[in-house]
């Protein structure tokens, strides 16, 4: 009997060592209006000697011990991935002025274990013990990699699991630079399968090269201004013009800025967004735009006070909810930390951009044979679809299918039958480019059903038009 008792203690201890950390488990999330059929965890991962990144893991509601691990990163640089969780692809969405949590039926954790990581230190609930928040692209990729190693030590059951990295916006830099590090660590990540980048900042200068024609063909720039830029700045060919360089040409600078400021009265993250505006709403989206322009040395746009960020983006609800004392306690957030903010001005202002173009990282990923999905909402102007299509074309990959054919439609199953979700181009090297019709910068927020189907089919190697039942 004594031997059996000792054996039981040993087995129990061994099982505990292989299990998720009980101290990080979220047992009571305030405001829930449903009972989750999955476990979720919130805590900290050590990213460097003085840097600790907050994570929130939402395990799969389908088969958590078998489904893949999917990392999600928001961009900025300097914005929190909890926005991705609460406003986009996570299972918990906030309403009623931060008082209630309702279930997102299009959550990605219906088929994957989704890890939301607030990066870099200083963003959201993440922190640095020495208060130095100046980081570069390469340092962020290193810190994210080290945080993932710490995650595997906390959750050893995920070691060897199929692993995917996803995200949007400035994560177009975070993801490729992190992927290169992961590819060099087969020991800890033997089943790294691929990446999915939404509306990514893959080539900063070309984003601005493509914005003037994008605006023009959306009837936002007058013929006389467009023709003036073409004639006097672009040798009569805007299609191949390095418009970005014209920002530094005194004869063209004002013309180009006037063209790009044509959307001042619109939501540049979704040109067709219809919403009442509230000047008191948190300025996350204005922050992202400012960071993108600062990164390439452009002046910040001027916004009218009443047209900054739409209230219906739910950002204010998120901010209110995550700063509730009972919510912070449930998520195991130290009381000594300051209030949660969607985007950190301090991180943004001190951020050092070193990767203006991620072609080398893409070439490394392609050579390694992992799957790559680049997707874009087609009415986003912050990181527009033409920029990313041209970025992939610059890789000189073979287009699969009929060379002269227009991009092929992909479909989703809607309430009234099958509908066009967007268009797709497939390249040799396991590279896919998809547009999401009618979506802006935040695809899982604007088109949740389409994005869920797209990602499910991507990681399961199915045709993007395949209907899903979850």
From Swiss-Prot:
Glycans are attached at residues 132, 316, 396. One of its GO terms (biological process) is proteolysis. One of its GO terms (molecular function) is serine-type carboxypeptidase activity. The keyword Chaperone does not apply. Disulfide bonds: none annotated. Residues 1-19 form the signal peptide. Pfam families: Peptidase_S10. The active site is at 169, 380, 441. PANTHER family: SERINE CARBOXYPEPTIDASE CTSA-4.1, SERINE PROTEASE FAMILY S10 SERINE CARBOXYPEPTIDASE. Belongs to the peptidase S10 family. This is Serine carboxypeptidase ctsa-4.1. It comes from Caenorhabditis elegans.
